[in-house]
């Protein structure tokens, strides 16, 4: 599920997502869902887990936006996570989190503070840290929703989409293409 609202940031969108899911649960008459991973309580606490702190806790090593890709490759090898040797540190962090931490998140959890390459359309973090204002909602160990504070700076957007188009040209199936019409509309 992905949804956006004009002038709303990631926190407003998280509340909207929670409201939508809980309304659906009420409509079908259940507050809990039994799964092979455990009981999902849709009306319990909805936690927030930062990508870097969450990964750090799971692997027992402090991971920050400054962590070198070589360290992350060693962690991937130790945890038997398949990676592409061409991936940079941001991509490695995102993949490691998805493979190591995400499957352990049974109850609703907003995973937030991703590296910029994870969502090129998201606004830079208001703290000034090299992060973006975006989250994925994980329920039952799987991504069930996503949203972000939308990037409205055409200069930053062009830089990100240009970088993404280079990744796409190099064979990255998840990278975005350069969209000149979109960029002109922002300008």
Which residues are covered by each model-predicted region?
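Short, polar/flexible loop-turn hinges at active-site or ligand-entry regions and domain interfaces
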Residues: 7-11
């Amino acid at each position: 599920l992905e949804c956006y609202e004009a002038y709303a940031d990631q926190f407003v969108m998280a509340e909207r997502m929670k409201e939508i899911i809980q309304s659906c649960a009420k409509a079908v008459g259940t507050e809990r869902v039994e799964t092979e991973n455990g009981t999902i309580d849709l009306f319990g606490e909805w936690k927030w887990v930062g990508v870097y702190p969450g990964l750090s806790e799971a692997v027992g090593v402090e991971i920050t936006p400054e962590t070198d890709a070589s360290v992350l490759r060693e962690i991937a090898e130790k945890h038997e996570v398949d990676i592409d040797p061409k991936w940079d540190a941001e991509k490695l962090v995102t993949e490691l989190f998805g493979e190591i931490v995400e499957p352990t998140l049974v109850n609703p959890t907003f995973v937030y503070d991703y590296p910029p390459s994870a969502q090129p359309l998201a606004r830079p973090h208001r703290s000034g840290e090299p992060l973006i204002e975006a989250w994925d909602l994980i329920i039952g160990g799987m991504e069930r929703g996503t949203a972000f504070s939308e990037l409205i700076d055409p200069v930053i957007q062009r830089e990100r989409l240009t970088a993404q188009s280079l990744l796409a040209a190099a064979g990255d199936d998840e990278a975005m293409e350069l969209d000149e019409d979109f960029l002109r509309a922002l300008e």
